[in-house]
Amino acid sequence: MSDSASSTFHKINQNTDYFKKKKKIISFFDQNKEFMKKTQKVTIINLSKIILDNKIKEIDILKIDTEGFEYNVLKGIENFDFTKIKYIYIEHHFDLMINKGYKLSDINMLLNKNNFYKKYKLKMKFRKSFEYIYENEKK
C-alpha cells in the first residue's frame, strides 16, 4: 500500500543529455520559470482502492506510464489484488533526467514476489527507455 495519501512529482535533473534534447519542448514553460522549480502536492488514490471501489474482479492488462512513478504505483497494489491482474505493461526510463529514487530491479523484485515475470522488453526509439510486459504466472 502507498506510504501516504499524497505524493510529489519528481525533480528534473537539468544537467542530463536527455534534458538538453528535450529543452526545446520544455522551453515552452520558460515564461514561468517558477513552474519548473516548485513542488506541487497531488492527492493520490492507490490502485487497490480503485479495484475495491469499482468491484473489479479481473484485469487483463494494467498499463502504467507515469513518467518515473511506476514503482510507487505498483506499491499501491495490495498483494491480494495482484492475483486479479493477468499482465502489467510498464515503461521505464534509464536516463537520469527524472530523479526516481528506485531502480528497475526494485520493480522486478516487487513483481516477482507477486508471481509476475518479464515476458517482453521493447526499446523505445530515440530514448533510453524500454517498455516491459510482465505476466502473472498464476493466471
Where are each of the predicted segments found?
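Conserved acidic-Pro-Pro-aromatic motif
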Residues: S48-K139
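Glycine-rich adenosyl-binding loop in Rossmann-like folds that engage adenosine-containing cofactors
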Residues: M1-I45
